[in-house]
Amino acid sequence: MDKKLLEILVCPLCKGKLLFKKQELICKFDRLAFPVRDDIPVMLEQEARLIPLEEKDKL
């Protein structure tokens, strides 16, 4: 993922900073993981995966 793009992208819900990990953009605050498909972030809430509490602690 392009570092410049990662610097300007934020969570669409809380506007918090995102972490790029394993083809997902992760918002620790909302516990959501947004998929990145073909280097294009899919920043739709309905496409996001809810991160279980156990997994969030490992981020």
UniProtKB/Swiss-Prot annotation:
Disulfide pairings: none
Pfam families per UniProt: Trm112p
A GO CC annotation given for this chain: cytosol
Domain of life where this protein originates: Bacteria
Coiled-coil intervals, chain numbering: none
HAMAP family from the UniProt entry: UPF0434
Family: Belongs to the UPF0434 family.
Protein name: UPF0434 protein lpg1920
